[in-house]
A protein has these predicted regions:
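Beta-strand->loop->alpha-helix junctions that form or flank phosphate-binding loops
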Residues: 27-32, 131, 212, 228-240, ...
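N-terminal glycine-rich anion-binding loops that anchor highly charged ligand groups
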Residues: 30, 35-58, 83-88
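Glycine-rich anion-binding loops of enzyme active sites
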Residues: 48, 55, 88-177, 296
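Helix N-cap motif at beta-to-alpha junctions
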Residues: 271-277
Length: 359
């Protein structure tokens, strides 16, 4: 009698998947079909939501070193995309290239992270692919369902709409900073996709995006897609994660850099027409969700916030494009950002000089 696990590859896949919870809608067992077969009851007005993402740069740059976190984030980056469109997850497909000399304990922790993240989000690994190569590369594709055309997109915000976030911002960039600088300062980083909030805000939010690439990238993308500007509330810094502000202070860096970096905290940023704010507050109370107001949409193009009691416009295009430079390292990344900060400070001094002259 043949045994599937007498083949090395089959045995490896069995060992990898044995601790995963099995989806109740999955038809085939392990190895039984070329594609995973699911019993999905799709109604006429329901939609499939599909997204895919890889964990590559974070591993190569040393932001993610812990195998458990790598596994956790492989799932969460995709779940966050589903949350942004108000989808309920069906499952994830995980594709991984493993170095042949990879320590078994590393591999075990990697898949513990994947499995725990799925449990946290109420979903399942429903399939995938495992291969071997020179370096670790891992990605996942997530599938979700939205009901009765109840989905959010990045399009729809209008001047006068109010901006909210599902939680405090900045922890993603603070964590990346500590890892890239190999700092003794430590901050816990284990984001959870805001699936519950994403569904709750449907019908209230006029647009929605996640902060997977950092808050400024999200704000800038909304401005470009909707041809609007954004003005942050005066107390925007109060909406930054407290421990992250301590980290940025230790490094002697301006607080707005917690918004600027492109390693996010996986919150949702969404806009709400002002007449629907009372509904949002009611839902927030009923579902024990904590939405934070952070700004408003305006006609005046640009991204404006208050720094040291003076309103400035951040050059979001320049800030985003800095991250695309070749041969990335922390110093070459921070230098142009600090040059921007210095320019903002000079503009502020010039403003007050002109004000004094006019008196």
């Amino acid at each position: 009698m043949y045994k599937l696990n007498s083949i090395t590859e089959n045995k490896l896949i069995e060992n990898i998947t044995k601790n995963y919870n099995r989806s109740p809608i999955q038809i085939n067992n392990l190895q039984e079909s070329d594609s995973e077969l699911l019993n999905i009851n799709i109604l006429e007005n329901d939609q499939l939501a599909i997204t895919t993402d890889s964990i590559v740069e974070e591993i190569e740059m040393g932001i993610y070193k812990d195998p458990y976190l790598i596994g956790w984030m492989t799932v969460m980056v995709n779940m966050s995309d589903l949350a942004a469109v108000s989808a309920t997850p069906v499952g994830v497909l995980v594709s991984e290239i493993l170095p042949e000399n990879l320590d078994e304990s590393f591999r075990t922790k990697l898949h513990e992270g994947i499995n725990d993240a799925c449990k946290e989000c109420g979903t399942y690994v429903i399939g995938g692919d495992t291969n071997f190569g020179k370096q670790l590369i891992i990605s996942a594709t997530a599938i979700g369902i939205t009901k009765n055309r109840m989905f959010n997109t990045r399009i729809g915000c209008k001047p006068g709409d109010v901006l909210y976030t599902t939680g405090k911002l900045g922890i993603g960039n603070a964590y990346a900073l500590t890892q890239l600088a190999e700092s003794e300062c430590q901050i816990e980083y284990k984001p959870v996709a805001k699936l519950k909030a994403g569904i709750a805000i449907w019908g209230i939010a006029s647009c929605c995006i996640d902060t997977s690439d950092g808050a400024i990238a999200a704000f800038d993308q909304l401005m470009r897609l909707n041809n609007v500007g954004i003005k942050m509330d005066l107390d925007w810094a109060a909406k930054l994660d407290t421990n992250s502000k301590s980290i940025i202070y230790e490094f002697g860096l301006p607080k707005w850099l917690l918004l600027a970096g492109q390693h996010g905290e996986f919150e949702l940023i969404f806009s709400v027409p002002s007449e629907k704010e009372s509904i949002l507050k009611k839902i927030s109370s009923q579902l024990s969700l904590h939405f934070l107001r952070i700004g408003e949409i305006q006609n005046n193009k640009g991204f404006f916030l208050n720094i040291n009691d003076h309103q400035v416009e951040l050059p979001t295009e320049k800030i985003r494009n800095i991250a695309s430079q070749k041969n990335f390292n922390l110093n070459t990344y921070l230098k142009p950002l600090l040059e921007i900060d210095n320019s903002l400070q000079n503009n502020k001094r010039q403003y007050f000089d002109n004000l004094l002259t006019s008196l």
